[in-house]
Design a protein with these regions (language model features):
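Non-catalytic, surface beta->alpha helical segment in thiol-disulfide oxidoreductase systems
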Residues: 74, 79-109
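Conserved hydrophobic/aromatic "anchor" residues
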Residues: 2, 26-27, 81
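Thiol-based oxidoreductase modules, predominantly thioredoxin-like and allied folds used
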Residues: 26, 38-45, 49-64
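Cys/His/Pro-rich metal-binding microdomains
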Residues: 32-35, 79
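A short beta-strand-turn-helix
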Residues: 1-22
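A short glycine-leucine-enriched loop at secondary-structure breakpoints
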Residues: 68-73
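Acidic phosphotransfer microenvironment of two-component signaling modules
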Residues: 1-3, 63-64, 97
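Short pre-active-site segment immediately N-terminal to redox-active cysteine/selenocysteine motifs
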Residues: 19-22, 27-30, 74
Length: 109
């Protein structure tokens, strides 16, 4: 899944494997702001379909990925990864305008 499609962790440094830029949403089922943002993320995934890939990672199910690899400390956390593998991180609930701005700035520029 994620390891073979998005990141390769086999070497010394993680390597981005995605064909397109992506947004990774680190969330928890018990996180209120995460649940409130979920419908917006679905809409944006459709809006940017074919240009930006979206992934949702449940931090409780993917403890190693969330905690050890990306060191996610608060939810929701969004990682915007461009085609070169550069990562921009945003933590906390944000509105659609901010999310779109981040996608346009960090994923599509």
């Amino acid at each position: 899944g994620f390891n073979s499609k998005v990141m390769d962790f086999s070497g010394d440094m993680p390597k981005f494997l995605g064909a397109r830029p992506c947004v990774i949403d680190f969330y928890a089922t018990w996180c209120g702001p995460c649940q409130r943002m979920a419908p917006m993320i679905e809409i944006l995934a459709q809006k940017y379909g074919g240009k930006v890939d979206f992934y949702r990672v449940d931090v409780d199910k993917e403890k190693e990925l969330a905690g050890d690899v990306f060191v996610i400390e608060a939810m929701p956390t969004f990682l915007n990864i461009d085609k070169s593998g550069a990562i921009n991180s945003t933590t906390g609930a944000i509105n659609a305008k901010e999310m779109i701005s981040n996608i346009e700035k960090f994923c599509l520029d």
